[in-house]
Amino acid sequence: METVSSSAIGLVIAIVVVVASIWIYKAATGVMPGAKLVLAPPAGVQPSGVEENVAKFMFFYTTWCPHSRKAEGPWKSFQQVLKNTPRKYGGMTLQFEDVNAESQTGKASLYGISHYPTFKIQTKDSVYEFVGVPSVNNFRTALIGTFGQETF
C-alpha cells in the first residue's frame, strides 16, 4: 500500500485554498481576480480633463514588446470600424490615443503602466482598465459592459 507524502497533501491543500479564494473573491466583487476596474483615477490623474459624455480609449505600448505589436492590429481595426460606422457606447463618444510608453514615460507613469500592452479608458469621473485578449469584439463587449448599449 502506497503512502501519500505530507508534501503532496500540503500541495493539495494549497490548491484548494487558492481555488476557494478565487471563488470567494469573485462572489464578493463580481469579477475574477486580475480583471481590473479602477473606479477612482490613479494618483495625479485629473479626470476633469475629459469632457462629459466622452471616453478616451488609450493604448499604452512599446516598440520592443511582441505583445504590443500583436495588439496593434486589433486596435487599429477597432478604430477603423468606428471611423467607418460611428457609434457610441451608453451615450459615450470614443476618442482614441496611442501612447508610446518609451517616449511618453511621464504619461505611462501617471497611469501606473507596468506592463504592455495596456488599455485604459478615461471618462470625466473614472479610469477603467481593459483586461483581456485585444480584439474588435472584445473591445466592443468591454465598452458595452462598462457604459451600456452600442448605438449608431
Language model: regions and residue ranges:
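Single-pass alpha-helical membrane anchors
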Residues: 1-30, 75
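Ser/Thr/Pro/Gly-rich low-complexity linker/stalk segments immediately outside membranes or between
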Residues: 27-49, 54
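Local sequence-structure signature of Cys/Sec-based thiol-disulfide redox active-site neighborhoods
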Residues: 44-84
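Beta-strand cores of modular interaction/reader domains in eukaryotic scaffold and signaling proteins
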Residues: 56-59, 95-98, 118-120, 129
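Non-catalytic, surface beta->alpha helical segment in thiol-disulfide oxidoreductase systems
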Residues: 115-152
